[in-house]
Amino acid sequence: MLIDFHTHAFPEKIASRAVGKLSYEGGGLMPQTDGSAVSLKEQMKQDGVDISVVLGIATNPRQQHSVNDFAMALNRDPAFVAFGSVHPDAPDALEELERIHAAGLKGVKFHPEYQHFYANDEKMKPIYRKISQLGLITLFHAGHDYGFPPPYHAMPEHLLRA
């Protein structure tokens, strides 16, 4: 069984815009799909991938519910294992983690550059504690990112102190 642990898919209405933005910010990395779940499944078939872990990001506090609703819908397809996302500044981040867990999502993805926080920020402690209590996987987009200038928010030293 071949599992691709880092893929992205977006709702149809924003897929092309999201892929365009990621392409522009990606330092020359070209997307292999049009951003839709249908296109991702086609690419999986071409590449012999059985399961894709789909990672979405709530880039602002208002997005976390819609990002997670999409992840929950994707999870109905056995070809996908979607992770949820919470935004560190969302007032209901802890409650959203409960919803992610109750829906059967396996983990939570953070992208400190897009979400504007350091991995070792104090404000993250209650979120990390709740993730641990719920037994969810925590995944960071870490290190250098082509789309963002320094300083980087999830370098190894930040993760070690998180």
Residue positions per predicted region:
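Mid-domain alpha/beta scaffold segments of enzyme catalytic cores
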Residues: 1-125, 130
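Catalytic pocket-lining loop regions of alpha/beta-barrel enzymes
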Residues: 106-107, 120-162
